[in-house]
């Protein structure tokens, strides 16, 4: 019985391992970029993710983030993204990764405001979670607006070596 359970566990884990090790060929990267450029709906986004998540790096990563944030700021048909994230924890993690991406920083405050003030009926849990993820002031989230915010800390003088 233990052998059957072990074999079953291995058989179930094999497809996951194969996905994790899939290499993004040059052809895959080109196809992924084309697919990402055509994303106009939550369904397109989810399909592109399923087809090309193994290519989610470099320009494809930025393209995915741009497409996701464009849809988020458009704030339409949220039931589709909410349902997709509810049924697939890996997809949900991927969405959260992209909304926290540095490439998404310019849109995070808008998404936060939409989630807090314009939540569609029956999407309260989705909006609350999304607002918490992109909440300004949270590490990785949109910075809290304040006067004098700078991207870098000012340089501090280096003490002169003691020559005595």
What spans do the regions from the language model cover?
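Intrinsically disordered, low-complexity segments enriched in glycine/proline and serine/threonine
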Residues: 5-6, 132, 156-159
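Sec/Tat signal peptide C-region and signal peptidase I cleavage site
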Residues: 14-20
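Eukaryotic intrinsically disordered, low-complexity regulatory tails and linkers enriched
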Residues: 149-164
């Amino acid at each position: 019985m233990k052998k059957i359970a072990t074999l079953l566990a291995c058989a179930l884990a094999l497809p996951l391992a194969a996905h994790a090790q899939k290499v993004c060929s040059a052809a895959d990267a080109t196809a992924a970029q084309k697919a990402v450029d055509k994303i106009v709906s939550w369904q397109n986004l989810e399909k592109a993710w399923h087809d090309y998540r193994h290519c989610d790096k470099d320009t494809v990563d930025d393209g995915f983030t741009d497409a996701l944030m464009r849809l988020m700021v458009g704030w339409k048909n949220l039931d589709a993204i909410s349902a997709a994230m509810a049924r697939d924890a890996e997809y949900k993690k991927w969405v959260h990764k992209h909304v926290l991406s540095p490439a998404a920083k310019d849109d995070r405050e808008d998404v936060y405001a939409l989630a807090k003030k314009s939540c569609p009926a029956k999407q309260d849990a989705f909006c609350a979670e999304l607002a918490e993820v992109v909440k300004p002031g949270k590490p990785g989230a949109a910075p809290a607006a304040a006067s004098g915010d700078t991207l870098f800390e000012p340089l501090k003088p280096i003490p002169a070596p003691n020559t005595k």
